[in-house]
């Protein structure tokens, strides 16, 4: 049976990451040259080191290409050698110590002991994430934003008290780092009750913790991509933050008529998709978002979801709206939000007076370019791409382990 990642990442052009695929291709050469026979699973230490060093040679070259790209972009240039090799490359906020990350992750990845499975998409993704966390551990981190579903908790579930990620979030707060749940879920109520219910396990744990009040106040929730901000108060829980104090000036000038036109156009497109693709779902319209959710007990097919989100994106892009929007696949529903996570991260940096994107991290599970709402955060902060809440915990533990060295 084909794995989920083979279906998602290998067969669908719009679901590929060119940079990861390029590195994977580079690493396939030493794999072929160094692959052993089936009887060599327990290879010698000398053989392992030789194999890893071949991978390291390539990753060192990639490190140098990234550093050169950063330098050229900082000087106002646009075309580096890396850009020519991977045309879709945009910006790196920091160098990436890929070799160090590979060696640190080798006990988990077992790259040197594999004879039949070459370094994969997931292996490269893990090395990139590990390298980013390694750099941040050495150079400082002021803010971490997390997607919600499939990053902190399973899709559609609340953040319950027994979720092991909670202790890691509290550890970040204890170090004076801003922790933000940056979620697409948009609830415009000023009471914040929906977010309080959704994140009750975390909020209760913070209340019961020995964190200082100043550390507790560093927890925030930004909902609807970049629309509703709530700050944690030690006495009153999540409290509404007025938009005038944290939204970027340009966001305050967005024409209300254009926002309505975007939502109307998206709603019309989604209704057409429901009818044309025989989707058993209903439209949900909110103040700054519109989407469809399946009827009770229904599970929508991936192809239906992808077709709907891509058609919605294309329809809106043709109209050339000035107001940013995000159309994305939520796993079993489709949504179109006003704003995006790039703006969300930029708003937070402005609100917290953080000097540079290199001191901010966004962790999420949706970084492919089409129909995925974490992708745009790359333009505002460093990022780590996870595939599950368990991986989020692993990466955070990896970060903490490097802080101790």
UniProtKB/Swiss-Prot annotation:
Active-site residues annotated for this sequence: 147 (nucleophile), 149 (proton donor)
Domain of life: Eukaryota
GO molecular function: ATP binding; IMP 5'-nucleotidase activity; magnesium ion binding
UniProt record, GO biological process: inosine salvage; nicotinamide riboside biosynthetic process; nicotinic acid riboside biosynthetic process; nucleotide metabolic process
Residue numbers binding ATP: 108
Keyword Nucleotide-binding: yes
Catalytic activity: IMP + H2O = inosine + phosphate
Assigned GO CC terms: cytosol; nucleus
Binding residue positions for Mg(2+): 147, 149, 365
Signal peptide residue numbers: none
InterPro entries with a match to the protein in the record: HAD-like_sf, ISN1
Record: residues binding IMP: 147, 149, 155, 183, 333, 341
Coiled coil segments of this chain: none
Enzyme Commission number(s) of this protein: 3.1.3.99
Cofactor(s) listed: Mg(2+)
Complex and partners: Homotetramer.
Similarity comment: family membership: Belongs to the ISN1 family.
Function, as annotated: IMP-specific 5'-nucleotidase involved in IMP (inositol monophosphate) degradation.
Protein name, per record: IMP-specific 5'-nucleotidase 1
Native species: Schizosaccharomyces pombe (strain 972 / ATCC 24843)
Gene, per the UniProt record: isn1
């Amino acid at each position: 049976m084909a794995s989920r990642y083979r279906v998602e990442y290998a067969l669908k052009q719009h679901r590929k990451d060119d940079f990861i695929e390029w590195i994977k291709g580079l690493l396939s050469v030493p794999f072929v040259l160094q692959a052993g026979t089936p009887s060599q699973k327990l290879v010698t230490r000398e053989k392992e080191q030789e194999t890893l060093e071949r991978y390291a040679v390539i990753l060192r070259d990639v490190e140098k290409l990234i550093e050169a790209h950063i330098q050229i972009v900082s000087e106002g240039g646009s075309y580096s050698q890396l850009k020519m090799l991977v045309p879709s490359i945009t910006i790196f906020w920091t160098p990436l110590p890929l070799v160090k990350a590979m060696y640190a992750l080798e006990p988990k990845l077992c790259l040197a002991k594999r004879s039949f499975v070459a370094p994969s998409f997931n292996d490269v993704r893990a090395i990139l994430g590990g390298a980013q966390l390694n750099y941040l551990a050495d150079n400082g981190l002021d803010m971490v934003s997390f997607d919600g579903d499939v990053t902190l908790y399973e899709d559609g579930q609340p953040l319950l008290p027994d979720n092991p990620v909670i202790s890691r979030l509290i550890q970040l707060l204890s170090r004076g780092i801003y922790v933000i749940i940056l979620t697409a879920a948009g609830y415009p109520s000023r009471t914040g009750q929906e977010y309080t219910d959704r994140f009750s396990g975390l909020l209760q744990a913070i209340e019961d913790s020995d964190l200082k009040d100043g550390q507790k106040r560093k927890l925030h929730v930004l909902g609807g991509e970049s629309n509703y901000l709530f700050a944690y108060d030690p006495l009153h829980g999540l409290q509404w933050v007025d938009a005038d104090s944290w939204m970027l000036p340009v966001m305050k000038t967005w024409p209300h008529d254009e926002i309505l036109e975007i939502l109307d156009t998206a709603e019309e497109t989604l209704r057409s998709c429901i009818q044309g693709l025989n989707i058993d779902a209903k439209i949900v319209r909110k103040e700054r978002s519109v989407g469809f959710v399946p009827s009770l007990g229904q599970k929508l097919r991936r192809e239906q979801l992808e077709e709907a989100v891509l058609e919605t994106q294309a329809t809106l892009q043709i109209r050339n709206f000035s107001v940013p929007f995000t159309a994305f696949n939520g796993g079993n529903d489709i949504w179109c939000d006003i704003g995006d996570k790039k703006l969300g991260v930029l708003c937070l940096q402005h609100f917290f007076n953080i000097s540079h994107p290199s001191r901010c991290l966004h962790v999420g599970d949706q970084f492919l370019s089409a129909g995925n709402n974490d992708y745009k955060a790359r333009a505002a902060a460093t990022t780590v791409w996870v595939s599950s809440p368990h991986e989020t915990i692993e990466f955070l533990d990896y970060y903490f382990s490097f802080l101790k060295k």
